[in-house]
Amino acid sequence: MSLLFEEIDSQPSELGEISLRRRRIPALGDRDIYEVKLGEEFLMSSMFVEAEEALSTLGLARTRGDKLNVVVGGLGLGYTAVAALQDPRIDELLVVDALETVIGWHQQELVPLGKILNADPRNRYVHGSFFDLATDSAGGFDPEHPGKRFDAILLDIDHSPTEYLNAANADFYTSENLALMAEQLKPAGVFAMWSQNLPEAHFEALLKTVFETVDSHVVSFYNPFLSGESTNSVYVCVKGDG
């Protein structure tokens, strides 16, 4: 281990070796940057979290009422979940992740936001495939309350609607399976999804076959590696009242 780089943990998974790393970049000062890597692919960095946080703020801004029950699909480094818990209307947050190792990093507080999530009684980790649970309308996301419906579902797993962490995830992005997931939303419930790309018209059209309203937001943030701006997107969809 050096001062500038440390591999905190590395474990096998169904998708390949997954590792948690911490590094410092001298040009950026004394800032610890946490990274999650799957095989040779970088999944998440604490250096760029603006869009992950915006997924929560933009999605929850469209919800109605109080005592919200919310699902976050994809734990990552915890930024979407922690941003959601900053909304005082949250009554319960289920964070679903297929990788038990990632949940363990948070439970063991190997990542900075683990302590925040563990200390909040509204937060609960669910180990399972988001995509399998999303299309299981009888069982659903909450193993303790089968068939439960939610005020919002916030998804950040795949890179985009056309670039998948796992090729099997492609099956989710159809009208049929999006509609199955929408059955787990309450009337006027919200589905929001992060993408690394700019909004894609064909995916917006697909979402409109299921949801009453669909809005796409471009989230901009400074990227020091480019000495300029980078962008991600957040799709925010609202189910009909009926």
PLM regions: where:
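Short "lid" loop at the C-terminus of a central beta-strand within the Rossmann-like core
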Residues: H159-P161, Q196-A201
